[in-house]
Every structure is written in C-alpha cells, then in structure tokens.
Design a protein with these regions (language model features):
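Mg2+-dependent prenyl diphosphate-binding active-site environment of isoprenoid biosynthetic enzymes
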Residues: 6, 12, 22-189
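Non-catalytic interface/linker regions that flank or bridge core catalytic/transmembrane domains
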Residues: 1-3
Length: 190
C-alpha cells in the first residue's frame, strides 16, 4: 500500500470512528448533536489522526485505542476551529468549503458545540482499552496541549496581536502553542 493510500485509509477510519463516538443526531439535544456531527464529519485533512496512527503503527498499538485517541484529538482540533470561526474571534463564514458552524446553526449553538466536543474528546479517550496509567497520561497531555499552555494560549496570543506585528519569536510561540501542541500529542503519546 502506498503512503497516500495508507493516509486515505486512516482518514476513512477516523471518519468512521468520529461517527461512532459522536452522539447520534437523533438523540436529545438533537440540534447540538447535529451541529457536533456537522462540524466533525464535514471533511478535513485529518493530519493529527494520521500522526496518531503512524506512531501507533510503529509501537504496535491496539486498533481501538488508536481510533479513540485519533478521534479525541480530532474532536479537540475541530472544537478549536468552531470557536476560532466565531464572530468574537476570526468571524469566518466558510470552513472546508461549507458554512461555518455558527452560520449553519447559530453562535450560541456553535459555542456549545465547541464545549461539547472538548468534553466528548475526553470521554472518548478514557474509554480506550489501555492501562489506566496510560489513560491518565493521555488525558493530562491532551488537557495541557489544548489549554492555556497550548492551543487556547496560542489563540489568546493571536487575538491579542490583532492589528500588531509580531516578531519572529512571538509568531513562533503562537504557532507552537496554537497548532503545534496538538500535532505534538498526535505523534508522541500513543
């Protein structure tokens, strides 16, 4: 199998995992669940899940554990995109060629989608068939990577810099925190 074919297989596997671990749109609250599914199952490069599966392949990791880790990291990534698109942040109206979550639904629903995806990510991760010590380490690492020391902190730097020029060090710090933290966990903690 070529690398491109393998990446496509991982993307498809991730799509199926997200579909499996997200609440069904038919369950209450239906609008929230439909919006979560809209945000997560609307395409994307799935770079972080590819890195999870690559690291897992090298380590000989359990397939279900990889699926859960990949889905959890992707849920956190998607929640960050949903929040990033909000009018109070970047005010984007398109994501992956489709209306953003707050445009397709509404701002309040989009905010709740981000919140729900973050907690769903941790709920998905803790059910992985792994040793409890490994799960605790994964949860700790994902929390740090997505919090003030990682993705959220990078977004705060980005927002504070609106209308200002960042120097090279500040720009690198913002990108390492905002983007690099989840990529790092994706390849390092399987």
């Amino acid at each position: 199998m070529s690398f491109q074919d393998w990446m496509q297989a991982v993307r498809q596997r991730t799509e199926l995992a997200l579909d499996r671990y997200l609440p069904p749109a038919s369950h209450n609250p239906q609008r929230l669940h439909a919006a979560m599914r809209y945000a997560c199952l609307n395409g994307g490069k799935r770079l972080r899940p590819v890195l999870v599966h690559a690291a897992g392949a090298v380590a000989g990791a359990n397939a279900e554990a990889l699926d859960r880790c990949a889905a959890a990291i992707e849920m956190v990534h998607v929640y960050s995109l949903v929040h990033d698109d909000l009018p109070c942040m970047d005010d984007d109206t398109l994501r992956r060629g489709q209306p953003t979550c707050h445009v397709q639904f509404d701002e309040a629903t989009a905010l709740l989608v981000g919140d729900a995806l973050q907690t769903q990510a941790f709920a998905t991760l803790v059910e992985a068939p792994l040793a409890s010590t490994t799960i605790v380490e994964l949860v700790r690492t994902l929390a740090r990577a997505s919090g003030a020391a990682g993705m959220a902190g990078g977004q705060a730097i980005d927002l504070a810099a609106v209308g200002q020029a960042l120097n090279e060090v500040q720009l690198e710090q913002m990108h390492v925190m905002k983007t690099g933290a989840l990529i790092q966990i994706g390849r390092a903690h399987v």
